[in-house]
Amino acid sequence: MTRVLLTGAAGFIGGHILDAARDSDLEIVAVDAMLESAHGPGARADGVIDLDVRDKDSLVDVLRGVDVVCHQAAVVGAGVDAADAPAYASHNDYGTAVLLAAMYEAGCSRLVLASSMVVYGEGRYLNSSGETVIPRPRTRADLDAGLFDNRDPISGEPLDWLLVEEDSTLEPRSTYAASKLAQENYASAWAVATGGSVIALRYHNVYGPHMPRNTPYSGVAAMFRSSLELGRAPTVYEDGKQARDFVHVHDVAAANIASIEAELDGFTALNVCSGQPITIGEVATILADARGGPTPEITGRYRAGDVRHIVASSALAEQTLGFRATIMPRDGLTAFADAPLRDAEGTGPPRV
């Protein structure tokens, strides 16, 4: 039986992985730091060891006999402002570095890492000449004028988005994104130095039951849900035509189980996505229709640092892991409209 250390086991995605593992031939050692910013003060989770991945001595103890680490522990979300940077660096990057050092000391050579699509930055686009273009970040002047689409840096013409593949340029645009790319870089260097194996799963927009309620660190689907529960119209930024890939948490858990069971060499990054593009406006409308709530409000406002379109190719994950999402966004979001959410007792900013 494969013995797995699961970090972040009390979190949204970690909890679903823990549930999925019960139906597989895996022995799970579940740990979580139970940060107040995520779980509230004094929170505990049944069957989960209270452990911070920055504590190397405790990690080495629980790593004895572990075959694979499934590393979900992280401070998540785009953040509120630059003051969040130390928390991301401490929990995500330093925490991952400590974990990798502890794995080396304990003789554990396989890692499944929760990464994110945010490492791609603006994504990939096609210009009118059929050339692939990596656009510059959108300017405040264009956004203020309601010009939301990415434009060719030379001609100024609007660009068409392309599916993002794993070998696309990595250009993080937020503190959180920078921390996720740093995690990948540490893990890749560790794999080279130790001969270990890393599968970095680049999650796209994850949603599903027990997602945290409306906080600045929640996903947009949960924020739309929270507005509808209060009888308010979901507020959609820009023109609502931003394309994304929404992937159900049950599929994300399945991708992790498949990665734990796979035996790959070196460092491999894989998109975890539904393979079905959908716009943010469509997400809001599906949820509003399913709940019989108010029509979403397209605000025309924007958030600095948001990317316009980011939609993934699912081909490599299917080829490498045999993983293919089973829940398409329209069906999954309709069910999510009435799914239970987790009360976010910890609504403050993450702390170092």
Task: State the predicted function of each range.
Residues 182, 186, 190, 220, ...:
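Hydrophobic alpha-helix immediately C-terminal to the catalytic Tyr-X-X-X-Lys motif of short-chain
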Residues 13, 58, 62, 179, ...:
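Hydrophobic alpha-helical packing elements
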Residues 1-203:
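N-terminal Rossmann-like NAD(P)+-binding domain of SDR-like oxidoreductases, especially those catalyzing
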Residues 37-38, 120-123, 210, 280, ...:
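A short beta-to-alpha transition loop/helix N-cap that caps and shapes the active-site region
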Residues 99, 187, 224, 317-318:
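Structural element of the ATP-grasp superfamily
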Residues 228-352:
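C-terminal substrate-binding subdomain of Rossmann-fold SDR/epimerase-dehydratase oxidoreductases
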Residues 81, 155-174, 198, 202-213, ...:
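A conserved pocket-lining segment of Rossmann-fold NAD(P)-dependent short-chain dehydrogenase/reductase
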